Amino acid sequence: VIAIDPNEWKRDQAIKFGATHVYPSMAEAIAPIIDLTYGVMADKVIIAVGDMKGEYIEEALTLTTKTGTCVVTGMGSMLDVDVKLNLFLFTMLQKTLKGNIFGGGSSHVETPKLVGLYKSGLLKVDEMVTTTYSLENINDGYADMLDGKNIRGVIKFTESDW
C-alpha cells in the first residue's frame, strides 16, 4: 500500500495503518513506484483528496498500470469541469477511470460487513479518531480538518446539545 500526502504527520499515520511506502506528492512518487513495481505501476489508484482538482487525474493515471483502475473519491467544485489526460495512453493501455462515493456498495450489504470487521479488530475505526469535539467547539474541528491535524475528528453530542 502506497500513500501519497503532502502532510508529513498524515504520512506517518498512513504507515501506522498499513502503508508500506509514503510520498509527499504524486510527482515524487513516480520514480520510486516504477522501481518498486519494476515499471508495472499500481493496479488500483484511489484519489481521496479533500479538494479534488482535474489536474490530479493525469498524474494518478500515470501511476496506474495497464488495464488498471483509477478511482476518484475526492470531491471537487461543481465548477471545475476540466480534466487533462493523455487519451492515446488511456485508450491503448485500457485504463479505467471511475467516480465513487461511499465505496460504491449498498449500505444494507456493506454496513454489516464493516461492523463485523470492526468487531473482529480488523477495521481500526477508533484509532482513526484523533480528536473529539463538543458541538460548541465545532469550528475548532473544522479548522483542524483544514489544517490537516486529524485523520478523523468527531463531534460528540450531549443532551444539552438537543
Would you name each region that the model predicts?
Residues D12-Q13, F17-T96, D161-W162:
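Glycine-rich cofactor phosphate-binding loops and adjacent beta1-alpha1 units
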Residues I2:
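Conserved beta-strand positions in the Rossmann-like core of class I SAM-dependent methyltransferases
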Residues W9:
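Conserved Rossmann-like nucleotide-cofactor binding loop
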Residues A27-E28, E58-T62, G104-W162:
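C-terminal hydrophobic helical "lid"/dimerization subdomain
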Residues M75-M78, F102-S107:
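Short coil/turn segments
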Residues L93-N100, L123-K124:
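Short, local alpha-helical segments
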Residues H21-V22, L97-G99, M128, T132:
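Conserved beta-strand scaffold positions in the cores of enzyme catalytic domains, especially
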Residues D5:
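Conserved acidic E/D residue at the C-terminus of a beta-strand in Rossmann-like folds
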